[in-house]
């Protein structure tokens, strides 16, 4: 791998990506969560954080949005540190499902075991493994982990949380199904609530890029200098992001971008260039798979301009 791009190179790539992404059309806000449908569709933000801790932004980089499924990639770090990679893989698995992120079919076809921690079934099972004697203690451990990644105190978007809690019957069904097969490790209603709360965290593109930069920096937050995940657990987490980070269009993303990434239906996207930097984008309109349209275009533009694709020699 070549050296970290200079801040001047990043600034140019960032400005070019922002200008390009503004012209990209298509996509619609997530409609199945009412509060997400109301987010202004014209918002666009891009942020880059290097392993040196430098932050560069374009657009509405401090506009908060719901982290949604991106949270899965960071709660995964806490649980992997807690119980170890081998035990986590035995309980949850590490393979793409080939199905939509909220599918129950993959559970039924594989004896009730969730296949990976970045789809809803596996992510809720991962939350069920977080330590704590009650809901408050479990949430305290979860939010402490997120705050360490973001180097700030994150808060729950109450409007999103209430909206999702009123419409998460499908996730409740998934949790009970996993429990019936013996692949759920705490009380389903409590865990679904904690999972919903986790997905409702407010985040900004700047904060999300810093969270990703912790992975780019081998598990150490490049701003606070705190270790937030064991170094040996970073590669398997990034591998999961390569396999399942953008739902059932992850293959298309990897074909075009060649970097581990994670998206959320709130319009966020984070990608990691190991040893160099992480980048995040926010734009609410989504493609049919649930990924930000402009965000993908923006980050792919930066990846091309800075030659960050992992598969380029």
UniProtKB/Swiss-Prot annotation:
Where, by residue number, does substrate bind? 69, 120, 164, 171, 195, 247, 265
User: What top-level branch of life does the organism fall under?
Assistant: Bacteria
> Which leading EC class covers this enzyme?
hydrolase
Q: Does the keyword Zinc-finger apply?
A: no
Q: Which reaction does it catalyse?
A: L-glutamine + H2O = L-glutamate + NH4(+)
Please, one GO biological process term? glutamine catabolic process
Q: What is this enzyme's EC?
A: 3.5.1.2
Task: Recite the UniProt keywords alphabetically.
Answer: Hydrolase
Membrane spanning residue stretches: none
Q: Which Gene3D superfamilies match?
A: DD-peptidase/beta-lactamase superfamily
Read off the Pfam families from this record: Glutaminase
Q: What GO molecular function terms would the record report?
A: glutaminase activity
Tell me the subunit arrangement.
Answer: Homotetramer.
What is the similarity comment for this entry?
A: Belongs to the glutaminase family.
Concerning NCBIfam families, the annotation shows: Gln_ase, PRK12356.1
Q: Which PANTHER family match?
A: GLUTAMINASE (PTHR12544), GLUTAMINASE 1 (PTHR12544:SF48)
Protein name listed in UniProt: Glutaminase
Chain's gene name = glsA
